[in-house]
Amino acid sequence: MTQFEDKFMEVQASMVSLALEYVQNQADKIFIYAIADSLYSFNLFYEIKGNIVHKHLVNDFLPTKSHIDTSLQSLLLKEGVKDVKSMLDVCQEYNREHPTEMWLIYDAKKNSLDSRYSYEGRYDKDEELLPRLEFEKWFEEVKEQDL
């Protein structure tokens, strides 16, 4: 692998690590949606014990003794945005086009990462497109597939 690919993978691994840390490594899968377009955004949801779960509801699916502090959500998202910006820095350092959207799915059981990237710049082109709505759309798609 090239240095660029190594560094790019490091940033993605950092995103996954951050997401795992939030749930104390208790998720089966992590779904990360990141944007680096006319805005920066980072959001995620989980699969825990076969349930597709928003980050603020993870305690509903974790054992009581291992509940997490959901007040850390804003810190989680801020750190995620830092990783998105790091990804941009890596792409600029190697003079590579950066993805404007990323969909990452980490399977903790298999220790595998599936990724999909878009380079379209949809948010730059469409002022009515909202990250929250696109994130919710993906959440619902995954939830329907999982049933």
Which role does the model predict for each range below?
Residues 1-58:
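N-terminal "first-domain core" detector
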Residues 73-123:
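Amphipathic protein-protein interaction modules
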Residues 65-72, 82, 137-143:
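Low-complexity, flexible helical/coil segments
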Residues 108-147:
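Acidic, proline/glycine-rich low-complexity IDRs
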Residues 45-73, 132-133:
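DNA polymerase sliding clamps and clamp-related checkpoint/processivity subunits
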Residues 2-11, 71, 75-82, 130:
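Alpha-helix boundary/N-cap detector
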Residues 14, 83-86, 134:
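Exposed alpha-helical structural elements
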